[in-house]
């Protein structure tokens, strides 16, 4: 069956105040990979899609001489996390270690010259192990910024608290600031905080996955405003964002040009996995305890994702790994270089094992149908 493309619904206005100020954004991929088990993060299951080994994107945000890091990824010696977290890691995932953010800053030979000692603040999107890194690697002049309620559920950490999920060393001697969204600022439908006070960088309240979960929005150009949205773990796969009624699934022939694999008519096979204007997945309750809030957060991101002027980067998007400029390069020129349009549907290649499975299944069913017809004749 060939599905006709759906007419897209016009996306809503971004609702972002004008500003002449921008920040430089550098995406940091430390090389660490984390296995994502689909049943933990998204639903429904797709036969043949058993998960993936995904990166963890962190971000260096520079506002003139001021530098902050949004998320730190996994520490290289993850066995030195709190014992409770080490047990969870061993039971639920596989970590393929790479480097870490402070090492990449301090060992960079590009001439950029931004070192760990220059970082004014580390921002945790939330307090899960694959985002908190090792804050103690930064000097005590580096503040730690967390979302609402995170201090209360995080500290005392281990070893003061035997059941701690973060470490005491993350905050010993360090200023910890908890973000407030009580000022009433809105970016799109998100409650927001203007981090530098000039409209260049916002922290956004994005609940659902964890207490105090934050996303961020950076203004990357001003004359024609463009933005990078840092989605953290608001969702764990682009298939929760797309297709949407703003970005419907393209034609089978267009998809065939995106997909890399041998099944005949892969675009038509892919169209059987979802409706043309509904995402492949929704968030799974197990890792999104506030399921209603998480679903609403994804809906808000879909509105930004539909804008030609906003590039959405979620933390674990494997499809972008070798397609976007990485540290020490900036990603500010993403629109001019057509990063968004050229990568929008690349994540569908994650489903190639599922398409093989579906192709084989339909081939078997077709053959059984032929045999049944022969017996009846």
From Swiss-Prot:
Source species of the chain: Annulohypoxylon moriforme (Filamentous fungus)
Name used for this protein in its record: Metallo-hydrolase mfmC
EC class of the enzyme, as a word: hydrolase
Database matches in SUPFAM superfamilies: Metallo-hydrolase/oxidoreductase
Known EC number: 3.1.1.-
Family: Belongs to the metallo-beta-lactamase superfamily.
Alphabetical list of InterPro entries matching this protein: MBL_superfamily_lactonases, Metallo-B-lactamas, RibonucZ/Hydroxyglut_hydro
Keywords noted in UniProt: Hydrolase, Metal-binding, Zinc
SMART domains tied to this protein: Lactamase_B
Binding site for Zn(2+) 2: 130-131, 233
Binding site for Zn(2+) 1: 126, 128, 209, 233
Gene3D superfamilies associated with the record: Ribonuclease Z/Hydroxyacylglutathione hydrolase-like
Main function: Metallo-hydrolase; part of the gene cluster that mediates the biosynthesis of the phthalide-terpenoid hybrid 11'-O-desmethylfendlerol. Within the pathway, mfma and mfmC act together to convert 3,5-dimethylorsellinic acid (DMOA) into the phthalide 5,7-dihydroxy-4-(hydroxymethyl)-6-methylphthalide. The biosynthesis of 11'-O-desmethylfendlerol begins with the NR-PKS mfmB that forms 3,5-dimethylorsellinic acid (DMOA), which is then transformed into the phthalide 5,7-dihydroxy-4-(hydroxymethyl)-6-methylphthalide by the cytochrome P450 monooxygenase mfmA and the hydrolase mfmC.
Listed pathway(s): Secondary metabolite biosynthesis; terpenoid biosynthesis
Keyword Zinc: yes
